[in-house]
């Protein structure tokens, strides 16, 4: 790889590590009342989460563990409560008031899938979660992890989590035209789709959802100034958190036969 190519890859790696993909909002007025709903067409099928559904229906505690990288850690928002797992907890708690919901954020910035997998036993399975949301693929794409190695790591991780009794949802990468121009995320996204399809594991299509938001003018892919970084990040994470809550809610309601709803705007 040329010196220019190496420089670009390192630069994009730093951008991705920030966890917001150079997203900013086109206008403050629109941002305050943003509608970041997700069309039903983004759900190929209702996620099947029988254990989570049963816990909600019986008003039992629902323990969720989120494991991932910088965009799950949410440091750019300035507070763990503003990261998408924190916003997910708030959204689910407001919807299922009779079933206590907790979301434990076990993210570490810039980790590959293999590095995350090495933490599963002690940091995820040890917590005996009802549901695990595994966000991965970004750092592997940046570092150029071999696809077969990536596939085997994801498969082994799913097997271990399921063997522990936890349900699993995978989350793919973020969308940004800036990073997509240099880093090939498509190959890793394809692997995630293949593995989740083969294992009948729900995949939260964050990449496609964020691209939909960008193409419809909700988010403008321009660089945010340092003074607005926390604000931009917190708004994005709130949208992601509520979209994941919609995803889980669809699975829970599908198990009861009730129609699924979409949160759309702020709760």
Where on the chain are the PLM-derived regions?
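Bacterial N-terminal signal peptides
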Residues: 13-24
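Internal alpha/beta domain cores that form substrate/cofactor-binding pockets in large enzymes
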Residues: 63-65, 99-127, 139-168
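Catalytic His-Asp segment of secreted/periplasmic serine-dependent ester chemistry enzymes
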Residues: 175-267
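Serine-esterase "nucleophile elbow" of acetyl-processing enzymes
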Residues: 34-106, 121-128
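Active-site segments of SGNH/GDSL-like serine hydrolases
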Residues: 135-139, 157-189
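Sec/Tat signal peptide C-region and signal peptidase I cleavage site
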Residues: 27-30
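Bacterial N-terminal signal peptides that target proteins for export
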Residues: 2-15
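Solvent-exposed loop/turn segments at secondary-structure junctions
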Residues: 70-73, 108-114, 138-143, 174-178, ...
